Amino acid sequence: MGSRFVRWRGVCASRRTACTARKGGALVARFAHITALVSWSSHTACKPVRTTIPEILGTQENASHGATEAGGRFQPHFRGPPQQHQLNPACEIGGTPTFVEVDDVFISRTPNRSADHDDSTNVTQAGRPDITNPQLKTLHIEIDGTWIDGNVAPPLWPDKLGTRLDVQGFVFWDPAHVDTDWHQHSGWELHPVAAWRYSAR
C-alpha cells in the first residue's frame, strides 16, 4: 500500500522506508450554497417540486397529438370543476405533490382575462428542440380569479410574447378543453398559479 499526498510535493522511492515532502500550495475550493425550494407566495406554505412542462405532460399522445391525462407525471392530481377554483389547494393528494416549480418557460400565447376573472396564457419550455411536437412542451396556465378577488394572487401576466418566466403553481387537469386547439388538445394546466418571476436565464 502507498500513500497519496494532495497538494504536496516531494520524492518517494519504493526501496526507501521514508519519504521527503514539502508543502506545494494552498488548496482552495468553492462551494455553492445549498438552497431548498420554497414558495414565493406568502399565501401558500406548500413546498414546490421542480419539474418541467414535458415531465408534467408525459409522452403519451391522444388522437389529436395532445398529452393524455394518464401519461402525466403527477398522479393523482386536481381535476375538474369541483377543484378548479380553490383558494387553498392541498399540498399533496395521496402522497403525490401538487405544487410545482417550472423554470425557464416563455409566454407563447397572448394573455387573456376570462369571464370568471382568471388571467390565463400558455407557456412553452425553452431549450427543448428535441421535442418536435409543440403540444408536448406547451402548457396552459392560469392565475385564478378566486385568488385575484381574494388579493392573494401574483401580478397578472406580462403581455409580451416570448417573455421568459419561472412559474410556481398547482398541477390540474381540465376535462373541458381536451379538444381545444389553444389548450394543446389536452387538459393539463397549472391552475391556480401561485407565483411567477422573470427568469434569470
Can you name each region flagged by the protein language model?
Residues 2-201:
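OB-fold and OB-like single-stranded nucleic-acid-recognition modules
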